[in-house]
From Swiss-Prot:
Residue ranges of the region described as Domain IV, binds dsDNA: 372-494
SMART domains from the UniProt entry: AAA, Bac_DnaA_C
Name of this protein: Chromosomal replication initiator protein DnaA
Similarity remark: Belongs to the DnaA family.
Domain of life, source organism: Bacteria
Organism: Bartonella henselae (strain ATCC 49882 / DSM 28221 / CCUG 30454 / Houston 1)
Gene: dnaA
Example of a GO cellular component annotation carried by this entry: cytoplasm
Gene Ontology BP annotations: DNA replication initiation; regulation of DNA replication
Spans annotated as Domain I, interacts with DnaA modulators: 1-103
Alphabetic keyword roster: ATP-binding, Cytoplasm, DNA replication, DNA-binding, Lipid-binding, Nucleotide-binding
SUPFAM superfamilies listed in its UniProt record: P-loop containing nucleoside triphosphate hydrolases, TrpR-like
Annotated S-S bridges: none
């Protein structure tokens, strides 16, 4: 071992020598693929979609999640499974920890180069996060609000308006300003893909309403926080007090509705929603899909949410992307007036990055970082290090109906045949193929897929999936058909 290598291991940890970031990322991807296969797409998306690798050494794995609730849920329900999967990946692993990411943004996990000692970045523990969370909640109560803390950056003033979000913004302002007309679209349901500004808009409503209402009876909650508070209240025999707090409000704002899980929790939320709407209290909800597609939700909740107005925020156009970059530059220059980025560069990034606002933010942060040690960045160089973003647009979600149409057209049957009880060979095979593709290409659960295929049981869907999986190994014609259908469905959804 060289002197440099000795220093690397010594500085990292004698007990847990650090593995390179590339190795860690590859191992994490393999374990996550195994996890998804075991728990299913829906459970994986709900509970592990925001799981990140924080640290990976020879004997220790640290995974991070954004909330204490997620940490607790994963530890209680999937802790043993995670540990077993990591031990299958690396038999030397002794411990797998799930920690909570801090409120403040931190750099990525440990990086270990050949000629540089690794820096183990500080992560907040669950206990420190809970202390921080409690502090924020106390401040919220003093300001007239309890629940998830608000980010001071998320205001109407900092929200970039454009054609893709103008209607949603107008509705949000109307609610925040207390216009009587707002009750006409109650509840307001805002849906959009990741990174398009849902959370920003919801927190802007809460912040503006808090300033206007005296006393302020406004509650902003993520669905996860609602679940955690409800579970904690039941555990502490304080459910009645919790319900009373929620019912004595003027404005309820719920974010990430797609994560609301559990029959008893959904039942309680349904009662709360009915009570507030029947009392002409304003409700605002956001999710990553429209109410009709939240199939894990109780039918009564979905029905009530569909009774208001659902507005979609779409991906930003060029003008919006450019304005986001200009605003981001102004904020950065307030911290460091030596930062100089030409408008030509901002225009180039706005033209080439076609994804979400989060992609824009990521590109700008990359640019700032590179500029700190590469003073003269050409457009070619920028395109080089932003390549993973410049060619990534937000792909449209594939729907089961689109799969059914494509399969019916390919096999020359009707969509109604796929949903029927007909058992002829000419219908059974296309139906099984469509169910298989629905499982592979969408995040829907087996029961949800069964309902979309004429109200079938989830075991029927599982049988179809396994049947196609068995056949495709030996049937090259079927394998080619599946690849063709996947391509046609992808083109149809693009």
């Amino acid at each position: 071992m060289t002197d440099v290598d000795s220093k690397v291991v010594g500085n990292a940890s004698l007990e847990h020598p650090v593995i390179s970031e590339e190795e860690g990322a590859a191992a994490f991807a393999r374990v996550m693929a195994q996890l998804k296969a075991q728990v299913g797409i829906e459970a994986y998306t709900s509970w592990f979609g925001r799981l990140k690798l924080a640290e990976y050494s020879r004997n220790l794995v640290k995974l991070s999640v954004p909330t204490a609730f997620l940490r607790s849920w994963i530890n209680n329900h999937y802790g043993s499974l995670l540990t077993n999967l990591w031990k299958q990946e690396n038999s030397a692993i002794l411990r797998v920890e799930v920690i909570v990411r801090g409120m403040k943004r931190v750099s990525k996990a440990v990086v270990c180069g050949k000629n540089a000692a690794p820096v183990v970045l500080e992560e907040k523990t669950a206990s420190s996060f809970l202390e921080n969370y409690t502090e924020h909640s106390v401040r919220g109560v003093e300001a007239g609000i309890f629940g998830s803390p608000l980010d001071s950056r998320y205001t109407f003033e900092s929200f970039v308006e454009g054609s893709s979000n103008r209607v949603a913004l107008a509705a949000a302002r109307s609610i925040a300003e207390g216009h009587k007309s707002a009750l006409r679209f109650n509840p307001l349901f805002i849906h959009a893909s990741v990174g398009l500004g849902k959370t920003h808009l919801l927190q802007a409503i809460a912040a503006a309403a808090l300033k206007r209402l005296k006393p302020a009876r406004v509650i902003y909650l993520t669905a996860e926080y609602f679940m955690w508070r409800f579970a904690t209240a039941i555990r502490d025999n304080d459910a009645l007090s919790f319900k009373e707090q929620l019912r004595d409000i003027d404005l309820l704002i719920i974010d990430d509705m797609q994560f609301l899980q559990g029959k008893s929790i959904q039942n309680e939320f349904c009662h709360l929603l009915n009570m507030l709407l029947d009392s002409a209290k304003q409700v605002v909800v956001a999710a990553d899909r429209p109410p009709s597609e939240l199939e894990s939700l109780d039918l009564r909740v979905r029905s009530r949410l569909q009774g208001g107005v659902a507005l979609e925020i779409e991906a930003p156009d060029y003008e919006m992307r450019l304005e986001m970059l200009r605003q981001r530059l102004k904020v950065a220059q307030q911290d460091d007036n030596m930062i100089v980025i030409s408008d030509e560069v901002l225009q180039y990034i706005a033209k080439t990055i076609l994804g979400s606002g989060r992609d824009i933010e990521g590109a700008f942060n990359q640019l700032l970082f590179r500029q700190s040690f590469e003073s003269d960045l050409s457009l070619e160089r920028i395109d080089e290090f932003l390549g993973h973003l410049t060619r990534s647009g937000e792909s449209k979600r594939i729907r089961i109906e689109e799969i059914q149409r494509a399969v019916a057209r390919h096999y020359n049957v009707s969509k109604q045949d796929l949903l029927s009880n007909r058992r002829t060979r000419t219908v059974v095979k296309p139906r099984q193929v469509a169910m298989y593709l629905a499982k592979m290409l969408t995040p829907r659960s087996l029961p949800e897929i069964g309902r979309r295929f004429g109200g079938r049981d989830h075991t029927t869907v599982l049988h179809a999936v396994r049947k196609i999986e068995d056949l495709v190994c030996d049937d090259q014609t079927l394998a080619k058909e599946l690849e063709l259908l996947k391509r046609l469905i992808g083109e149809q959804a693009a």
